[in-house]
Amino acid sequence: MDALQLGSYTFSSRLILGTGKFSNATVMLEAVRASGAQLITVALRRFNREQAEDDLFGPLSAIEGVTLMPNTSGASTAAEAIRAAHIARELSGSPFIKVEIHPNPQHLMPDPIETLEAARVLASEGFLVMPYITADPVLAKRLEDVGCASVMPLGSAIGSGQGVATAAMIEIIIRESGIPVIVDAGLRSPSEAANAMEMGCSAVLVNSAVAVAGNPPEMAEAFAEAVAAGRKAFRAGLMQKSGSAIATSPLTAFLGAKG
């Protein structure tokens, strides 16, 4: 079985789905089911058992095979992210935490210094830390060294739909990493997800591309199929690129044939 291993957890699906931006909870839940995703990320503010209409914890937990990964979206410092992680673990019981620290709402780029500090503390406390980062190979290695379960470099800015603009740096991270590398943010189409998997990414996280699609459940299914195809292609081994044409059939054998 070609499974995604995160800590002691094993997942057959390599598509991770976010839960923001959907028009309503019903559509979101339909998309989760259609995707077959087993790891679902949820903002801490959506854990609200006292307000059923705002709570996603109960409905998502009821889906068989789903593991929740709370995130610290909204945190602007390591201290805020650590506090959010503690609350999230208490509410959800999940050891996973996606560390998101982006202090500037104009571009939502993750703060590398605060992210590394939060990851160091949370990993030492037994969390399975999944940090959202810029595609920085040096930072990715430092996060691995402090005990993160994976690194999640951005493909492009959150919600931008610009695809994997950081492919060259992500390829370096993949080569040097001893933990799963998961592309997070910026994906617009299933073909981009397939390309990320063909590069050797362990998984992809998708949210906006599914949530704002004309038919979110159908798009979720399309992403699932693309991720599976990309992974299969990576394992099969892609042909090498060439700077010139290479014939697939003999070009000269027939010239010596007698009519």
UniProtKB/Swiss-Prot annotation:
Functional description taken from the UniProt entry: Catalyzes the rearrangement of 1-deoxy-D-xylulose 5-phosphate (DXP) to produce the thiazole phosphate moiety of thiamine. Sulfur is provided by the thiocarboxylate moiety of the carrier protein ThiS. In vitro, sulfur can be provided by H(2)S.
Any one Gene Ontology molecular-function term assigned to this protein's record: thiazole synthase activity
EC numbers for this chain: 2.8.1.10
Protein name: Thiazole synthase
Catalytic activity: [ThiS sulfur-carrier protein]-C-terminal-Gly-aminoethanethioate + 2-iminoacetate + 1-deoxy-D-xylulose 5-phosphate = [ThiS sulfur-carrier protein]-C-terminal Gly-Gly + 2-[(2R,5Z)-2-carboxy-4-methylthiazol-5(2H)-ylidene]ethyl phosphate + 2 H2O + H(+)
UniProt keyword list: Cytoplasm, Schiff base, Thiamine biosynthesis, Transferase
Top-rank taxon: Bacteria
